[in-house]
Amino acid sequence: MRLLAAVLAALALAGGAKAQVPTPATAPIKVKVFVAAMFEIGENTGDRAGEFQPWYERYWRQSAPKIVKGALKPVYCNPDGVCGSTLGMGKVNASASMQAILLDPAYDFSQAYFVLSGVGGTPPSRGTIGDVSWATWLVDYDLGHRWAPAENTAGAPTFMPRAGYEEYRRFQLDPTLVGWAVRWSKGAPMQDSDDARRYRMRYADARARAAPSVMVGTHMTGDTFFHGPGLSKEAQSIAKLYGADDYVITEMEAAALALVIKRQWGTGRILSLRGAVNFDQGAPGETTLQHLDPAPGQTAGGFAETVANIGAVGSRIVDHIVADWPRWREGPPPL
């Protein structure tokens, strides 16, 4: 009798163990392209657009939001493998979100391309309101030594690089990938506004007065919203000091995001796309403070048109990669 009871108990335990065997985990989403924006003004659709809205309206209207622990905003993915999220403004904020998303087992980034997108400023000698720029280099503006101009010889530099930052103070993006992005940008419709056209005429630079176009160059990443001709000149000198291309865009996140991605997957599939919504200095006769805090009616205009231009230009390379995925899966094909 005792033997029978023991056998029945063992069978019951075995049956219970079998019932508790976990079902196979859902396969992770294979990400082909991840689009990162830094902020949205209100909702993802139907109101004034920030950086994320043009992407959302193109790719994720029918997609459910997925919460990722540690990320600022949900991640959206469509059936084609195009995913994206709003990461937050500034290096730390955006990097924390990007790291959380990359480490989430629900997503497979092993063959993903990254489009880091947003708005920024441009020096009037290099760009204009409404321009869209693909980065050839990402440079960190903050890393190094600085001191007050009053403590220096007049006109001498007030920045000195510091040894030890060489591997993460600048990143050269893959020239072939950038070349494809530029090629597929040709012919993209570029919007403009009457307000932006009038505002450009305050500047003497031919480039500042030009119509919006697609350009390439160095994107300068700084948590400090640096402004004025002196700091613009310093940014240009840092780009030259590091062997990068001309500084054309100032922004707050891309170099930091590149480091986060590099430590997981390298930098060979990163694109940085920025639209210019302001100049990095005032017009002739305008102080830097006046330009930073303009009187009513004295703003640049063109914000809505610029974010539309970012989406129009960036979506071309995203769509091309997805449509020709067998060719792009293993890396950018030869130009």
Please identify what each model-predicted range represents.
Residues 20-335:
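Accessory terminal and edge-of-domain segments that mediate assembly/interaction
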Residues 5-14:
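Bacterial N-terminal signal peptides
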Residues 13-21:
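Bacterial Sec-dependent signal peptides at the C-terminal "C-region" and cleavage site
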